[in-house]
């Protein structure tokens, strides 16, 4: 009988104790071993009910503690999220379009290519010639677009443009490029030399290909579009591959000079009249049922900037109805307001400007 009676309360108590212990050790790890804390929580986020939301919240929270999560490293080719030389790196498995066999192929081809390099220092030109055609197109584009190759100090747009150009060469022309690439410092120089008949030391087999390769070289020298990376494009691309932006925040694509504070400053207790440039993550409507504002809609915002996120942004009735149409997810706005009385990390909104 006592076992049955005990079951009415022991289950809840045991869970309460378990959660308390987990919360204590998690807080201890976050305070004393922050890199390992974020690394392991990110690594096992797949077991959460909403993994993508969990990852985004962890990356944003880490940012507010001056810990930045990086794309996987070409140098180490870590498969899992890892702490390497005092930094947290996502793993290749975190890139959505890369399967297990593709990752094996990437690692094997990078290892083979390293043995051919004159030094241990990689450049984009080395990767393009020695590796890009040996793994599938999707994998090459993913490595470029997701930032794995960013340590090669070439813009992602330029890498994608040169990769697409190199893909247009025939297999014979690629063989010539692999045999002769050490004689050149760039793809355009290689193509200029390639665009000669074989009897003159070039790599084309007919006049038609001669014209095509020359045109490719000309397009590399005078690209039709800018090959500089746009922060907004990088944000969208990284969200596509990881579910969260790592290199930039959405506010990096707009002028933030009109702001006088950041999310991190406010979370750390900054007071007074404030202006802050943020991205809207979520807007929630709330209708009080009691008090002097009963029945009048108001709103609460979760916002984010390059330093972190906060959710204590309040719009009372007049402000909510005046600005609610610009409070959609992903929109960059300038908030003018003041810190709320009792909340250490809250803002009462006076004005909002769309950027």
Protein language model regions, located:
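Noncatalytic, beta-rich nucleic-acid-contacting surfaces in large DNA/RNA-processing enzymes
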Residues: 1-355
